[in-house]
Amino acid sequence: SKVMVNLDDLPFVHSDMEIDMLGDAYEFLIGRFAATAGKKAGEFYTPQQVSKILAKIVTDGKDKLRHVYDPTCGSGSLLLRVGKETQVYRYFGQERNNTTYNLARMNMLLHDVRYENFDIRNDDTLENPAFLGHTFDAVIANPPYSAKWTADSKFENDERFSGYGKLAPKSKADFAFIQHMVHYLDDEGTMAVVLPHGVLFRGAAEGVIRRYLIEEKNYLEAVIGLPANIFYGTSIPTCILVFKKCRQQEDNVLFIDASNDFEKGKNQNHLSDAQVERIINTYKRKETIDKYSYSATLQEIADNDYNLNIPRYVDTFEEEAPIDLDQVQQDLKNIDKEIAEIEQEINAYLKELGVLKDE
């Protein structure tokens, strides 16, 4: 309601305005509201620069998409960002929160997406999935981090989760979202998801699922580490995982450490256009760049017991310059000499004032 009240205050003249302007204004106000909404902001909005990275990844090399799917679509901003990068015929999404679900539908209409070209459902994605039997050219999401779910035994026979040998733990649904998204990904499609760093190294059931995705399926394409404090409502560092079912470079996984590339803000860090482009260009070229990115072999990942923690692959350590002890000693002598000279000057002034007498 706050978004709509602010939108109503804007001096629009419909006859002079394209529908895109109204949609962009709505998107802008959602972003402004997210900036003041605290933890709740993460439930419905992904910062534009992060959305841009995800969208460019899933549209890489494609001049059109038949469909794009976001299983936790929030206000729909991530879906719409994909449409800015390439032509999208149909948008699919699911959102549990009723208010946010309505935000998403309104966002679609205000961006001139015809009603028959989008299908947004209001339900719990993991517990009551929509669109079963469908696969999508692009699957994209910024799901709630380490959310709880039932992990009910019935899911052991669910086609989204069966075959992995384990279900994601009740206390952390991160890998349940990954499994769900992989299931909906077309054989020629690309999937990109934002998650906390814990998915890279946590063990037990999550370790089993992670190993299966890499060793058995070989779906993992890239791991991109993002800076901390760039999302609304949380300061934890996050990463982007990219999956493909038909990979061109089947023997390598690209690791990018962009955690130190950010612009410091008063309350929140953000990515500049140049920093976003560096991530995208490195991903496209699959480049190894000193202290920034590394193309690891599957054998290297296996040797690390399928632990994907980025510092294991990208060494960002900066060696300190060697200390010249002789120079340090000389500097200390010079400082002592300067102090002695200053003390002499002070004593001379004090004697002139009669404050200090000759001994």
Question: Which residues does each PLM region occupy?
Answer:
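Long recognition/docking surfaces used for binding and targeting
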Residues: 1-34
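SAM-dependent transferase fold signal centered on methyltransferase-like domains
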Residues: 3-6, 54, 191
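Hydrophobic face of alpha-helices
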Residues: 4, 22-26, 51, 79, ...
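Conserved phosphate/pyrophosphate-binding and hydrolysis machinery centered on Walker-type P-loop NTPases
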Residues: 15-23, 40-48, 171
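Residue-level signature of catalytic and energy-coupling elements of molecular machines
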Residues: 25, 54, 104, 241, ...
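Conserved adenine-nucleotide phosphate-binding loops and their immediately adjacent elements
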Residues: 35-39
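Conserved S-adenosyl-L-methionine
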Residues: 40-141, 146-155, 161-164, 175-176, ...
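A conserved structural/catalytic subdomain of Rossmann-like adenosyl-cofactor enzymes
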Residues: 129, 133-359
